[in-house]
């Protein structure tokens, strides 16, 4: 059975592999691997370390000592098109808060592989999990929000053609050893429009299962407007970002693993109060919503928490046209969150 690999994450920053070729116009230094290289990296796919959905994840080694994880999908034409789309997007992207493409394999038929940098702290969802031994400090949470907003601003407003990510969520935000964030997984991304894209005209003739496969986004993060209309837009990304900010402030999951309740539903009254009062909210309610694991940190500025909640609330507004752009969010956080000063020169893109 043929297969393709969609993700390789490297553990160190050094790599002795020299680029063998790159696509015309692509980011320099991206290595093109052969399928023999891919098999060698995984020792012929001998070390399975995880599975999920349509994929299996194998342990791999690069240059004999650098650990990597390879995410392998059962091959199909549809999955190959997803791979090709993500490859073409990543070859064009170069930003400090977007995961870096280091290499790829593509046989131009049904097999392909993306080699991406490894970030040792895992993803944001794992770090916010209340079972995590390490509590993510407040200033790191504000920095993550700011950096992700910068990444979204880059793909929305500084790329040509512009890009809609399509699946902004905490598990698609990776963290390096200093807890700087990088946006990953562009498999759902849409390219070539400034604000929105209509679904294919052939959608109405497809089976319910086919329609389901075409849907993008994840439970708890997906814009209700997209679910109603099938129109993916930049404002859809801002909705997902708003949910991530709620997670950062509260430490709660986008969808409760215990009750199955969505965070946007359990916080609806708070969001409405913020919007109805033009952003004004009492300190007691702010304290009640703040992650209780942060309550021992007396240095937290509640005005910063209020700013984060305002940003989240405005990103969740309906209709989507009322939501801020990524640039507006970057400007607001830059101006209203003093704790971002610890980022120094990294505060600016």
Swiss-Prot record:
The protein, known as: Probable receptor-like protein kinase At1g33260
Residues annotated to bind ATP: 49-57, 71
Modified residues (Phosphoserine): 171, 210
Keyword ATP-binding: yes
Catalytic activity: L-seryl-[protein] + ATP = O-phospho-L-seryl-[protein] + ADP + H(+); L-threonyl-[protein] + ATP = O-phospho-L-threonyl-[protein] + ADP + H(+)
Modified residues (Phosphotyrosine): 226
Active site: 167
Domain Protein kinase: 43-343
Modified residue annotations for Phosphothreonine: 34
Alphabetized UniProt keyword annotations: ATP-binding, Kinase, Nucleotide-binding, Phosphoprotein, Serine/threonine-protein kinase, Transferase
């Amino acid at each position: 059975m043929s297969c393709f690999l969609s993700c390789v994450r490297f553990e160190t920053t050094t790599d002795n592999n020299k680029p063998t070729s790159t696509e015309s116009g692509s980011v320099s230094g991206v290595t093109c691997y052969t399928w023999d290289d891919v098999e060698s990296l995984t020792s012929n796919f001998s070390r399975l370390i995880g599975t999920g959905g349509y994929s299996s994840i194998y342990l791999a080694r690069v240059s004999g000592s650098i650990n990597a994880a390879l995410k392998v999908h059962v091959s199909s034409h549809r999955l190959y098109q997803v791979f090709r789309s993500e490859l073409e997007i990543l070859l064009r992207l170069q930003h400090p808060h977007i995961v870096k493409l280091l290499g790829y394999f593509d046989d131009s038929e049904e097999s392909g592989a993306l080699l991406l940098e490894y970030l040792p702290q895992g993803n944001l969802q794992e770090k916010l999990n209340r079972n995590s031994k390490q509590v993510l400090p407040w200033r790191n949470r504000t920095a993550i929000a700011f950096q992700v907003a910068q990444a979204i601003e880059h793909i929305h407003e500084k790329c040509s053609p512009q890009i809609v990510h399509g699946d902004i969520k905490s598990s698609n935000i990776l963290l390096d050893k200093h807890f700087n964030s990088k946006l990953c997984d562009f498999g759902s991304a849409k390219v070539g429009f400034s604000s929105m894209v209509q679904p294919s005209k052939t959608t109405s003739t497809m089976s319910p299962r086919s329609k389901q496969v075409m849907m993008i986004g994840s439970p708890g993060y997906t814009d209700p407007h997209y679910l109603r209309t099938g129109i993916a837009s930049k404002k859809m990304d801002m909705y997902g970002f708003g949910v991530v900010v709620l997670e950062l402030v509260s430490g709660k999951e986008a969808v409760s693993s215990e009750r199955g309740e969505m965070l946007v539903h359990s916080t609806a009254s708070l969001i409405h109060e913020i919007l109805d009062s033009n952003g004004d909210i009492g300190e007691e309610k702010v304290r009640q919503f703040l992650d209780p694991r942060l309550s021992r940190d007396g240095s937290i500025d509640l005005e910063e928490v209020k700013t984060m909640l305002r940003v989240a609330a405005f990103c969740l507004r309906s209709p989507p046209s009322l939501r801020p752009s990524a640039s507006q969010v970057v400007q607001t956080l830059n101006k209203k969150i003093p704790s971002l000063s610890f980022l120094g020169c990294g505060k600016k893109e």
